[in-house]
């Protein structure tokens, strides 16, 4: 059994123990890692993978098996919405933060005649360098997304502050997103999922109600230092 396989087994067991019977999705964050590494996780049963950069993402889509369920979790630029959203086995885009980007994604999915799951990214920490819409504007954006025929409002996503992720027993960012979900579900009348928690804090995120955790280094080890355009990718379907 490979190290990656062992890590996945351990993480899945920890998730199951923390989830108290809920289904929590494990998304393997694979940015900068070569396809050979992703295939180790795939062969261990992993199907949901998260990528951050368009060019790297599109290359990996070509090389990985077609039953992979891709999550785009990087900063979403308007100029790249169409290419990213045109991937047929894209499971979700988790970083919608403006109506314009949502409409561009909706248009691309209309061309495919395939609806797409989307998450609204929320800036829960208030940091200027973090993407996402402010909590006070989330309801308006959710309503706009609901009106788009080829988008399925899946839930809310956040990338919390580094300092909060290092806390062992509480996390203000997770609390903000959890409270926001409750109020939005009452307002919109639909269930919403939470995508929050990474390698350093995914178990705590689950305690706050996360339905999807994005784990990278705990599965694959330290991330390579190359920029996405320099990553060597060599594998075949």
Curated annotation (Swiss-Prot):
One of its GO terms (molecular function) is pyridoxal phosphate binding. The modification N6-(pyridoxal phosphate)lysine is found at residue 31. The keyword Cell membrane does not apply. GO terms for cellular component: cytoplasm; cytosol; nucleus. Keywords: Cytoplasm, Nucleus, Pyridoxal phosphate. GO terms for biological process: vitamin B6 metabolic process. SUPFAM superfamilies: PLP-binding barrel. It is found in: Cytoplasm; Nucleus. Belongs to the pyridoxal phosphate-binding protein YggS/PROSC family. Pyridoxal 5'-phosphate (PLP)-binding protein, which may be involved in intracellular homeostatic regulation of pyridoxal 5'-phosphate (PLP), the active form of vitamin B6. This is Pyridoxal phosphate homeostasis protein.
């Amino acid at each position: 059994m490979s190290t990656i396989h062992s890590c996945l087994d351990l993480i899945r067991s920890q998730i199951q123990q923390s989830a108290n019977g809920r289904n929590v999705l494990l998304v393997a964050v694979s940015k900068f890692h070569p396809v050979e590494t992703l295939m180790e996780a795939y062969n261990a049963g992993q199907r949901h993978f998260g990528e951050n950069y368009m060019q790297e993402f599109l290359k990996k889509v070509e090389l990985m098996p077609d039953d992979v369920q891709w999550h785009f979790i990087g900063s979403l630029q308007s100029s790249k919405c169409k290419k990213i959203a045109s991937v047929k086995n894209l499971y979700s885009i988790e970083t919608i933060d403006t109506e314009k980007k949502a409409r561009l994604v909706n248009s691309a999915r209309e061309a495919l005649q395939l609806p797409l799951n989307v998450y609204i990214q929320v800036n829960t920490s208030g940091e200027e360098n973090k993407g996402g819409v402010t909590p006070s504007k989330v309801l308006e954006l959710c309503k706009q997304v609901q009106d788009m025929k080829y988008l399925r409002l899946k839930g809310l996503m956040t990338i919390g502050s580094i300092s909060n992720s290092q806390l062992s027993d509480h996390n203000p960012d997770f609390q903000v997103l959890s409270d926001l979900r409750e109020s939005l579900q009452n307002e919109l009348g639909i269930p919403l999922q939470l995508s929050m928690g990474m390698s350093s804090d995914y178990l705590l995120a689950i305690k706050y109600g996360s339905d999807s955790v994005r784990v990278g280094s705990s599965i694959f080890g330290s991330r390579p230092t190359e920029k996405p355009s320099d990553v060597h990718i060599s594998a075949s379907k």
